[in-house]
Design a protein with these regions (language model features):
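NAD(P)+-binding Rossmann beta1-loop-alpha1 motif at the extreme N-terminus of oxidoreductases
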Residues: 1-50
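Rossmann-like NAD(P)(H) cofactor-binding subdomain of soluble oxidoreductases
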Residues: 76-77, 81-144
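Active-site-lining helix/loop region of Rossmann-like oxidoreductase modules
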Residues: 153-245
Length: 245
């Protein structure tokens, strides 16, 4: 069994933490805010339903990034995209060459940003990987209750350095089986991430509705005209990918 640290305690972070705990791994779950742990602490664990069923015991919960990542063989960054730059700077000062960090999912350039911070800190980098989508399709359906609709198969993963992709896949296998596959390179994986295409236009073009809502009504925001904007952005993404080969 391995030691896995999850950075981010939202739906994806809790899904991974719960699943890995059920599989018998040592799990550390990090958040910048204690409030994210209140439900897990009060209930004594994480309840999983759907594609994974079970009640996982409470993992190590910490707001100290050093405590979370020190000695962990694998670190999963499951934080929102806007936090990747912050965590890249923090992790570059902490991670050691023998560790593996996976942005899951990343955004175009997440792994490159971490590599840049390693260079700025003049430190030898660890093995860095990113995916275009989360392995887990999941939602929080209540405090410390995660519904996993599916665990995806054949999710492309790319690494820095590129030549280490097979090593990363082998190191992730004890945790996630063979669900990750070689994604060629980080540019290909980054351009395969459709989150910005599908999520940003509905939110921006419905900004008043979003501001007035207690909870983001993401799946009710797409009108026929907004769908045209999404399609236009996606065509641009695909054209860029084709031009870059």
């Amino acid at each position: 069994m391995g030691i896995i640290a999850i950075v981010g305690a939202g739906n994806v972070g809790q899904a991974i933490a719960g699943h890995m705990t059920l599989l018998g791994h040592e799990v550390r779950l990090y958040s910048r805010w204690e409030r994210d742990f209140e439900a897990i602490t009060s209930t004594g664990g994480i309840e999983l339903s759907g594609d994974v069923e079970g009640r996982a015991a409470k993992p190590l919960l910490t707001t100290d990034l050093v405590t979370a990542v020190r000695g962990a063989d694998t670190i999963i960054v499951a934080a929102p995209a806007f936090a990747h730059a912050y965590f890249s700077e923090q992790l570059a000062a902490l991670l050691e060459p023998g560790q593996l960090v996976v942005f899951q999912p990343g955004v175009l350039g997440s792994s490159l940003e971490l590599a840049r911070h390693f260079a700025l800190a003049q430190r030898r980098p660890c093995l860095i990987a990113e995916t275009a989508t989360s392995l887990y399709t999941c939602r929080l359906r209540g405090p410390a209750k995660v519904f996993i609709g599916a665990i995806k198969q054949a999710v492309p993963l790319a690494t820095i350095p590129h030549a280490a992709c097979q090593e990363a896949l082998a190191r992730l296998s004890p945790y996630f089986g063979n669900r990750y596959v070689d994604g060629t390179d980080t540019l290909s994986v980054g351009l395969g991430n459709c989150n910005a295409i599908y999520h940003v236009p509905p939110a921006v073009l419905n900004i008043k509705t979003v501001e007035d809502s207690a909870k983001l009504p993401q799946h009710t925001l797409v009108t026929p005209r907004i769908a045209e904007v999404i399609n236009a952005l996606d065509e641009e993404r695909l054209s860029l990918a084709e031009a870059l080969g």
